[in-house]
């Protein structure tokens, strides 16, 4: 296979983990979302896909794609000037940072991603 080419294993779900991740980011208790903001939901989506490995191959790539897709779907992907909030280099960096992080640092990783999205909003 050529470099950068996906294998036949790419994107194959191992179990129902991906469905569980999607459910977890919109989970609520007592009528309130556990992750109330779009930024928190997007950050957790990236974190859970990268760390929980719901696919046999491609978890980082799928996690990065789903993160950007989720931001786009919820109209949180652009700065006020029309540029993307998260450029390609930042996306690679935060995805690899999450992948290399210790599970005990989950809150730090999620907070970093949330702050990065908010900081790029110009608020």
Regions inferred by a protein language model and the residue ranges of each:
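FIC/Doc superfamily catalytic core
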Residues: 1-123
């Amino acid at each position: 296979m050529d470099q950068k080419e996906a294998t036949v294993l790419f994107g194959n779900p191992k179990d129902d983990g991906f469905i569980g991740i999607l459910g977890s980011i919109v989970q609520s208790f007592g009528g309130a979302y556990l992750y109330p903001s779009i930024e928190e939901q997007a950050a957790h989506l990236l974190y859970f896909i990268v760390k929980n490995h719901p696919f046999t191959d491609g978890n980082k790539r799928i996690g990065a794609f789903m993160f950007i897709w989720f931001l786009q779907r919820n109209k949180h992907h652009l700065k006020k000037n029309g540029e993307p909030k998260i450029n390609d280099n930042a996306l690679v960096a935060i995805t690899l940072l999450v992948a290399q992080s210790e599970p005990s640092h989950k809150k730090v990783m999620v907070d970093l991603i949330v702050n990065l999205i908010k900081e790029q909003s110009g608020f």
